[in-house]
Amino acid sequence: MNLKEIHYGIEIETVKRTREQIAWAIHSVVGGTVRHVGIPSSYDPWEVEDLRGRVWKVVGDASLTSVPAHLRAEVVSPVLGYDDIPQLQEVVRAIRRAGGKINSQCGIHIHIDAAPFDGRHLGNLAKIIYKQEPLILHALGISRDRLNRYTRPVSDELIQRIEQHRPRTKDQLNRIWYGYH
């Protein structure tokens, strides 16, 4: 498996700027068109369709309670690949230049395409994360409140079930993890 062929998406939470300001910051890097696609009373979504037809979304995030609702934004990238890393870095820099900030409530979520992996690979990944999780959480300075609410650690029970059943397929892992396929 070539790691450079894996696709991913990322969600980045930011505060101190409106979703419109964040959308225009993204546009300054990716080009294309910016449009307001929602109503302010919901997630107030904005979209930036880049020059390649991919859509970057900027939505509200109710978990960022330390700032007024209009200054909470979550950037949702399109599906990206290895070659998009430099552009993603430029998007983050543009958001920072526009005044977007992070605070202790902000987080990121990285979604990795599971297609190249089977149940054995993903089970092993879960076990590696589980073993290194205390170090990762300490290095990132994750607050106890966030751990209790949003960033839940991998459970002992899940790892025990993975070790007991040793899944070979994603369907088997889904049944272990979620209790169904």
Predicted segments, located by residue:
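C-terminal accessory/tail domains of diverse enzymes
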Residues: 1-102, 115-181
